[in-house]
């Protein structure tokens, strides 16, 4: 890892923004266009991770105190803000171009804050897991681009059921920790493997969705939505990242 990762991520943000202005946006009025659909989506995906990791490394550089940041009220407020920002990104129409970008950036900063404890706990593991996640995502994406039929369109219902199951299992895990005053490592490890598999399938499904939407873009009356595409893929990858990190920690 670069001795000054914040500089690297700042440059990556700048290059991503430059690429977006050059390839993804038209002006008068400002809006997305269908040209370079897939490339534009991945520019936003790269920008997503660059903003989140820049937030993490900036907090580390400034030595933010975990005990002061991750208090009960702050955690609740951050969780609620994160949900509201995500709903805003998904529901606000494309014509509110600047508003959606502000929500997008704020959401990524919050996601960066949630990653900060993992970075502080073990920087070497954090960097290794980041590379592992990138490799898995790249391999899965290539497989879907080569053969989109690897993943069925109908799997989304089962993925959603799986996601609800994981949420319930996490709540049960917290209850176990509360009752026993210590984590159940076997339960946690199995659950983290389930998370990795689930979000591997989500990555494949969302990659196929990107391919389909790129083909149908000019038929869509609402136009392309690179922010929504990128945030879906970002959330898939960050959940996979978390699963891999905690598997290595167990």
Q: What residue spans do the PLM features occupy?
A:
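A hydrophobic alpha-helical transmembrane-helix feature that marks the membrane cores
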Residues: 1-250
């Amino acid at each position: 890892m670069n001795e000054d990762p914040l500089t690297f991520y700042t440059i990556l943000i700048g290059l991503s923004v430059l690429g977006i202005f050059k390839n993804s946006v038209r002006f008068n009025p400002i809006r997305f266009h269908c040209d370079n659909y897939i490339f534009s989506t991945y520019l936003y995906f790269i920008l997503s991770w660059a903003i989140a990791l820049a937030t993490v490394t900036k907090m580390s550089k400034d030595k933010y105190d975990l005990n002061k940041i991750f208090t009960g009220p702050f955690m609740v407020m951050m969780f609620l803000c994160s949900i509201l920002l995500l709903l805003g990104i998904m529901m606000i129409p494309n014509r509110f171009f600047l508003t959606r970008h502000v929500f997008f950036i704020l959401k990524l900063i919050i996601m960066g804050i949630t990653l900060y404890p993992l970075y502080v706990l073990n920087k070497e593991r954090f960097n290794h897991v980041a590379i592992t996640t990138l490799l898995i995502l790249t391999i899965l994406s290539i497989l879907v681009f080569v053969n989109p039929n690897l993943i069925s369109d109908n799997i989304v219902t089962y993925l959603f059921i799986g996601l609800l199951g994981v949420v319930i299992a996490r709540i049960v895990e917290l209850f176990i920790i509360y009752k026993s005053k210590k984590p159940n490592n076997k339960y946690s490890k199995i659950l983290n493997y389930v998370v990795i598999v689930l979000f591997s399938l989500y990555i494949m499904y969302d990659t196929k969705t990107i391919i389909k939407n790129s083909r149908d873009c000019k038929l869509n009356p609402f136009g392309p939505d690179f922010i929504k595409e990128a945030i879906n893929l970002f959330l898939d990858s960050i959940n996979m990242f978390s699963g891999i990190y905690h598997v290595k920690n167990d």
